[in-house]
């Protein structure tokens, strides 16, 4: 029986550096097996519940395709498709679903919700995104980085995240750096830095792996020598519009544009984004931003960068599926 069997996947820091490396290696193998048409279905007869309190494209599709590839069946419970937290407590929901399903994915709000599900379900629970952490995304990011710099260890790579770093992406990048030895730089206004306690915890852990975690407002110094530039949206649909103007004004200097790409001094630097991205005005929200704030060429990233050879965001998006598959196989398959 392998060491991941029946374990939860709630946040990266629940695992050792060796375990994260194992999941990445398994992801690589599963991706190659699928491409070569030799994938072994190790989840035949398994039933998986997908709880989504927040809608999603990539996470839902990744879990569903990964499950089907491996022979499992899924039940999708959308924002209006379950009684969780409304008529039925999280604890009770966990105990009901745990009797019917072999694994449960949760994407929604507080980390405490997914932790409670894990405490009471009796089956593996996987965090598809909470307000605090997004571990399946970072697993895909690390795989993508390995693929684009095959001659380098993660511990020899420099990842720069620019923009709003006080969110689940910033938090999870801190944990990823601590576990892999990355040179991580969070380049953001101080008002957008992650929780100081988590930063200190991850900086201490990074000393054991040779990692480096830097927080700075200095864009030029922060991006110099980067292997990868990463950003995320500045505003989300659920946030009150009154906050948008102030947030955009605060973060506008941190937009990923060709000047920032050039400032890295690395002509091979790659651009990452967890998507969706506001890089043009071809969406309802993109049009709003263009009309109200004059952001016609993109918000957190310009369309020029997004569509350039630097951008590897669609390889990154594909890798969500392969890494999620690895997590499910590792935690549900006995051999």
Swiss-Prot record:
Q: Where does carbamoyl phosphate bind?
A: 56-59, 83, 107, 134-137, 274-275, 320
Q: Where does L-ornithine bind?
A: 168, 232, 236-237
EC? 2.1.3.3
Q: Which GO terms describe its molecular function?
A: amino acid binding; ornithine carbamoyltransferase activity
Question: Which UniProt key words apply to this protein?
Answer: Amino-acid biosynthesis, Arginine biosynthesis, Cytoplasm, Transferase
A Pfam family of this chain: OTCace
Q: Which InterPro entries match?
A: Asp/Orn_carbamoyltranf_P-bd, Asp/Orn_carbamoylTrfase, Asp/Orn_carbamoylTrfase_sf, Asp_carbamoyltransf_Asp/Orn-bd, Orn/put_carbamltrans, OTCase_ArgI
| Enzyme class at the top of the EC tree | transferase
Q: Which GO terms describe its biological process?
A: arginine biosynthetic process via ornithine; citrulline biosynthetic process; L-arginine biosynthetic process
* Localisation: Cytoplasm
Q: Which reaction does it catalyse?
A: carbamoyl phosphate + L-ornithine = L-citrulline + phosphate + H(+)
Q: Where is the signal peptide?
A: none
* Pathway given in the UniProt record: Amino-acid biosynthesis; L-arginine biosynthesis; L-arginine from L-ornithine and carbamoyl phosphate: step 1/3
Query: Where does the UniProt entry say this protein principally localizes?
Result: cytoplasm
Similarity annotation: Belongs to the aspartate/ornithine carbamoyltransferase superfamily. OTCase family.
Q: What does this protein do?
A: Reversibly catalyzes the transfer of the carbamoyl group from carbamoyl phosphate (CP) to the N(epsilon) atom of ornithine (ORN) to produce L-citrulline.
Q: Which HAMAP family match?
A: OTCase
- What name goes with this protein? Ornithine carbamoyltransferase
The gene from which this protein is expressed is argI
